[in-house]
Amino acid sequence: MKSLLILLLALHPVFAQDAHHEGVVKRGDNVMGFSHEKTTHHFELLKDGGLIRADADNPNDVESRDQIRMHMQHIASMFSSGNFNAPMLIHEKTPPGVPTMKRLRKVIQYRIEPTPTGAEVRISTANSQALEAVHQFLRFQIEDHQTGDSEAVR
């Protein structure tokens, strides 16, 4: 019995992490307007910023593709104005980097680009503080969405 209790206590962080990720997915579906089960997210760190990308898993799923494009347009517009409510709602906390990204919003550019099955938001800046904040934000996204993307700058 004692061994079972020790095992359960050791596994508690794993269960808590899984429950948190399930919450991120569920809240994300509501906030973004498309299903995580039908789409794939990617986050990339670049020398001058980064990328937020989402694509429909099925190339014929035009509904998901169009919802992704609409969401990415909203993200680019909201982030440009310093509004980061969507990530805060999805993750239930302020992601790292957001306070600095809000403060330095005038030196960060957000450009949406359609992809064949979705869209991406290209984030760029020449400001070193803003760049560090963007990278913190994207690393958090990679971890919280469990995308498996590299956290290295390319």
Regions from the PLM with identified roles:
Residues 3-12:
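Sec-dependent N-terminal signal peptides
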Residues 1-3, 17:
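Generic structural signal for short, solvent-exposed loop/turn connectors between secondary structure elements
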Residues 16-154:
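Intrinsically disordered, low-complexity terminal tails/loops enriched in metal-binding residues
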